[in-house]
Amino acid sequence: MLRCSFVRVVRPQPMVVVADVEAASRWFQRVLGLVSGHGGSEYESLTDGGEMVVQLHRWEADEHPHLGDPNEPSRGNGVLLWFAMDDFDGFMRHVEETETVVLDGPLLNPNSGQREAWVRGPEGYVVVAAGP
């Protein structure tokens, strides 16, 4: 097996590009319980336990020329924002309390043995929570 000698730790830090960073941040805080680590209208870093979980970036911000096309209506076609949850039952209660749109679930995925809930996230993205 080929292994890169310079790679010590790899942590995903997905960036979601949205029109309204502040509204998307509020959704992730309200529904997933994440914490604002930056705040602002152009960029947000959302954390859990001090670790970055997801980044939000505004379409029109200039410093990243390869974010995509804001005029393309597809949001994450083929890409899902997937989060592991320690307390899946608590998450489902919270989803109900926040009136989050549930697309599917809760269901048991026979391949992973995990329960899943697929919900509508900000600006049309699909967010999946999975847990025991």
Predicted regions and their residues:
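Active-site-adjacent beta-strand anchor residues
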Residues: 17, 81-84
